C-alpha cells in the first residue's frame, strides 16, 4: 500500500526565538546556568550617533505619556500582609487587584460594570510606566514613551467600549460577549507583528524609524476579540534568537531577576505579563518563541499544531481555553477530545535530549522528576524512555536549509555594506548573504533529511504514548551580560560576518548549522515540535533554589490541543503552578476563592470564573478502545476517535497557518525559499517511491 505524501514548507529560522537557541560553548551552558549580574549591566545599545538605539523613533513629535489622570511616576508597591482579615475590594479598583486578575476576570468585572475599560487602561499604563524602565518589555520612543498615536487609539477604543456597555441594547453596536469574551481588556502585541502607527522594524537596526501603516492579522484578531491594544513588546531581530535582545531594542529584563533575560522571541510579551503590565499578550512560535519565555518567566505557553503558529502568553488556563475556542487564527479542524478520565492517558518522559551529547542541568532534571512524582501519586501512568525519538543534529540541518533563502533575511541584507553589516545580527547577515547564493550553493542538499522524516518519527512515537513530558529548556534563564552568557561564540560571530569570503559550499553550510548550537543546547526541545508540527504546552511548575521559574512541557500528537489544555487545567486546579505572586496569588480561601493583596497590605477575596466552551456537551473519548461519543458538532470544534487519528494526521498536512510567518508577516512563497524546499520535497518523494 502506498504511503501518503507529505508536503514540505519553509520553516523560517527566525520567527521564534528560536529556531535555534544559541549560547556559548557546551561547558559554558552548564557552568553559567545560575550566574547572573546586577541589573545595572542591562543597558540599551548605543547607536553610531551616540543616541539610544533601542527606542522606536517615529521621526516626529507624535509621542506622549498616557492621557490619564494617574501620576505615572508614582511608585506603588504592595506591603507585607499584617493581618489575616479578609476585606472587600477597595474602591476604586487598585493596581494590586488589576495585576492579580486574568483577562477573563477583568472582562467579567467590565461586564458587571464594576470597573470600566478606560480605568483598566489607566492602570495598565501606570504599571508599564513603573515596570518598563527596568524590564524593557514594551517598545517606546527614544525618550521612553509609547507613541502618542497608539495611546490615543487605546483610549478611544476603551471609551467606545464603555459607551457600548453603558448603552446596553440601545447601543448602535450592542455587545456580544460570546463573540468578544475579552471585551475591554488591555493587552500588548508582539513587536514583530504589524500594528498601525506602531514599530515596523522587526528589530532590525537598519530599519530604524519604519512605521506600520496598517495592522496585521494578529492585531486585527485581538481587536476582534475585544482587546484594547496598548502598544508593542520587545523582540530579538527577526525573532531569530531564544533570548530577547537586539542592536535596536536592547535586552529584556526578567521580572524575577532583571539581570537575566526573559527568553525569546516573545520575551517582551512574557515580561509584560509576568510583571503585571497586562494579563495576556500576543506571541508567535516557530522554534519555541512562546514556550521558552513562558518557562523562564513562570507563565503558560501553548504552541498549537503546526510548524509556525501564533498564540498568546497567559497566566491562567481559562484564558488559554477562551482564546483557543474563539480565535480565527487557528484553522478549524478535527480536534481530538480529552478522555473523561485524564488518567487513562499514557505519558512518556525522558531526561535525554535530541542532542545526544548534551546533559541536562540539575534544575531541569529535578523539575521533570518532581512532575513525574506528582503524576504517579495522582494515579497517572508514566513511563521513562531512554532515547529521544529525533536526532537533533539532523534536524538542525533541515532547519538551516529552510532558513537559507527565507525572505526576511534576504530583505534585511539588501543594500548592506561592509561598513554597516555589523549593525545586523550575525545570523541575519550570514543567512541573508547565503540566500543570494541559493541553497544548492551552500551544501549538498541531498544529504539533508526531508521534513517528513521527523513528522513520521514523532507519529510513530505517539502510536504508543498520548503525551510526551520533557523540560521546556535545559537550564534556567540566562544572564543579560554577554560576557557571562553570549548567545553566539565570538569566533563564530566573526566568521558569520565574513561568510561571503568562504568559497567552499560545504564549509559555509557547516558554519550556518554550527552557529545555532549554543542556543539549541540551552533550549534543545522546543524547536523539535515545530519540526514535527506537534502541539506542546509549557507549564510553570518549578522554582530553582535561586527562586528562578522553570517550566515543563507536554507535547502530543497533532490536533491534541484540548488534551494539553486539560492537562494544564489539572495542574492548575491542583495548585502546581509557580507564578510571580504579584500577578497570581497562590493563596486560596476555604471556599475556593483566590486571595489577593491591596497596596496597604489588607487582603481581598475574589472568585475565578470558569470558561465554558460554546459546545454544551463535550464528547468523551475512551483511549483504551478507541471509541467516542460524538454530540452535534460545532463549526470550529469537532471530535474524533483514536481509530480515525491516522486519517486526521494524513489529511491535516501543512495547513494555511504556515503560509504566513507569524513574526514577520512575510510570505514564504518567494523564489529563493522555493528552491531549497523543492529539492527537499523531491528527495523525500523519491525516497518514498523507492521504498514502495
Give the location of each predicted region:
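Paired acidic/hydrophobic, glycine-rich loop segments that form the ligand-binding mouth/hinge
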Residues: 229-230, 279-283, 468-470, 537-538
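Bacterial N-terminal signal peptides that target proteins for export
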Residues: 3-9, 669-671
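Gly/Ser-rich catalytic/binding loops embedded in alpha/beta enzyme cores
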Residues: 90, 94-280
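A cross-kingdom C-terminal cell-surface attachment/processing module
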Residues: 647-651, 655-690
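Amidase signature
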Residues: 63-177, 326-523, 531, 573-601, ...
Amino acid at each position: 500500500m502506498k504511503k501518503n505524501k507529505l508536503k514540505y514548507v519553509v520553516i523560517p529560522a527566525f520567527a521564534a526565538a528560536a529556531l535555534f537557541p544559541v549560547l556559548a560553548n557546551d561547558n559554558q551552558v552548564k557552568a553559567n546556568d545560575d550566574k547572573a549580574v546586577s541589573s545595572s549591566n542591562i543597558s540599551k545599545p548605543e547607536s553610531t550617533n551616540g543616541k539610544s538605539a533601542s527606542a522606536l523613533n517615529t521621526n516626529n513629535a507624535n509621542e506622549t505619556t498616557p492621557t490619564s489622570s494617574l501620576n505615572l511616576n508614582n511608585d506603588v508597591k504592595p506591603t507585607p500582609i499584617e493581618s489575616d482579615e479578609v476585606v472587600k475590594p477597595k474602591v476604586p479598583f487598585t493596581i494590586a487587584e488589576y495585576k492579580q486578575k486574568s483577562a477573563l476576570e477583568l472582562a467579567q468585572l467590565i461586564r458587571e460594570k464594576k470597573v470600566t475599560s478606560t480605568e483598566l487602561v489607566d492602570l495598565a499604563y501606570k504599571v508599564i510606566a513603573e515596570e518598563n524602565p527596568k524590564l524593557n518589555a514594551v517598545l517606546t520612543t527614544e525618550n521612553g514613551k509609547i507613541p502618542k498615536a497608539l495611546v490615543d487609539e487605546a483610549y478611544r477604543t476603551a471609551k467606545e467600549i464603555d459607551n457600548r456597555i453603558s448603552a446596553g441594547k440601545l447601543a448602535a453596536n450592542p455587545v456580544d460577549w460570546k463573540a468578544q469574551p475579552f471585551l475591554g481588556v488591555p493587552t500588548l502585541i508582539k513587536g514583530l507583528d504589524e500594528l498601525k502607527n506602531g514599530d515596523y522594524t522587526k528589530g532590525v537596526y537598519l530599519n530604524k524609524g519604519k512605521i506600520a501603516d496598517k495592522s496585521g492579522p494578529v492585531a486585527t484578531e485581538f481587536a476582534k476579540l475585544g482587546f484594547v491594544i496598548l502598544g508593542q513588546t520587545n523582540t530579538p531581530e527577526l525573532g531569530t534568537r531564544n533570548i530577547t535582545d537586539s542592536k535596536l531594542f536592547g535586552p529584556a529584563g526578567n521580572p524575577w531577576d532583571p539581570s537575566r533575560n526573559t527568553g525569546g522571541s516573545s520575551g517582551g510579551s512574557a515580561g509584560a505579563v509576568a510583571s503585571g503590565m497586562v494579563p495576556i499578550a500576543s506571541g508567535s512560535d516557530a522554534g519555541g518563541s512562546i514556550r521558552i519565555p513562558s518557562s523562564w518567566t513562570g507563565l503558560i505557553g501553548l504552541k498549537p499544531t503546526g510548524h509556525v503558529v501564533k498564540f498568546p502568553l497567559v497566566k491562567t488556563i481559562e484564558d488559554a481555553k477562551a482564546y483557543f475556542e474563539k480565535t480565527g487564527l487557528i484553522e478549524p479542524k478535527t480536534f481530538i477530545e480529552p478522555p473523561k478520565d485524564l488518567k487513562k492517558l499514557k505519558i512518556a518522559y525522558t531526561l535525554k535530549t535530541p542532542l545526544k551529547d548534551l546533559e541536562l542541568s540539575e534544575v531541569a532534571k529535578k523539575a521533570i522528576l518532581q512532575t513525574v512524582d506528582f503524576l504517579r501519586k495522582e494515579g497517572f501512568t508514566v513511563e521513562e524512555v531512554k532515547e529521544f525519538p529525533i536526532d537533533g543534529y539532523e534536524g538542525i540541518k533541515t532547519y538551516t536549509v529552510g532558513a537559507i533563502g527565507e525572505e526576511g533575511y534576504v530583505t534585511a541584507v539588501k543594500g548592506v555594506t561592509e561598513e554597516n553589516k555589523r549593525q545586523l545580527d550575525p545570523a541575519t547577515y550570514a543567512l541573508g548573504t547565503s540566500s543570494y547564493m541559493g541553497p544548492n550553493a551552500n551544501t549538498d542538499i541531498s544529504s539533508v533529511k526531508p521534513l517528513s522524516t521527523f513528522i513520521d518519527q514523532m507519529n510513530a512515537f505517539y502510536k504508543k504514548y498520548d503525551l510526551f513530558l520533557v523540560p521546556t529548556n535545559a537550564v534556567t534563564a540566562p544572564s543579560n551580560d554577554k560576557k557571562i552568557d553570549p548567545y553566539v561564540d565570538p569566533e563564530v560571530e566573526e566568521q558569520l560576518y565574513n561568510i561571503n569570503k568562504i568559497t567552499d559550499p560545504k564549509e559555509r553550510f557547516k558554519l550556518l548549522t554550527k552557529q545555532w548550537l549554543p542556543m539549541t543546547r540551552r533550549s534543545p526541545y522546543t524547536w523539535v515540535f515545530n519540526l514535527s508540527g506537534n502541539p506542546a504546552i509549557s507549564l510553570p511548575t518549578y522554582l530553582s533554589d535561586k527562586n528562578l521559574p522553570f517550566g515543563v512541557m507536554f507535547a502530543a500528537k497533532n490536533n491534541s490541543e484540548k488534551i494539553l489544555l486539560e492537562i494544564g487545567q489539572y495542574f492548575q486546579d491542583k495548585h502546581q503552578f509557580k507564578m510571580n505572586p504579584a500577578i497570581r496569588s497562590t493563596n486560596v480561601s476555604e471556599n475556593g476563592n483566590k486571595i489577593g493583596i491591596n497596596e496597604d497590605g489588607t487582603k481581598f477575596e475574589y472568585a475565578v470564573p470558569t470558561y465554558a466552551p460554546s459546545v454544551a456537551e463535550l464528547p468523551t473519548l475512551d483511549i483504551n478502545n478507541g471509541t467516542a461519543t460524538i454530540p452535534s458538532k460545532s463549526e470550529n470544534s469537532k471530535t474524533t476517535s483514536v481509530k480515525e487519528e491516522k486519517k486526521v494526521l494524513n489529511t491535516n498536512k501543512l495547513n494555511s497557518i504556515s503560509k504566513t510567518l507569524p513574526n514577520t508577516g512575510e510570505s514564504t512563497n518567494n523564489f529563493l525559499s522555493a528552491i531549497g524546499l523543492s529539492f527537499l520535497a523531491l528527495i523525500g518523494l523519491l525516497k518514498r517511491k523507492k521504498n514502495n
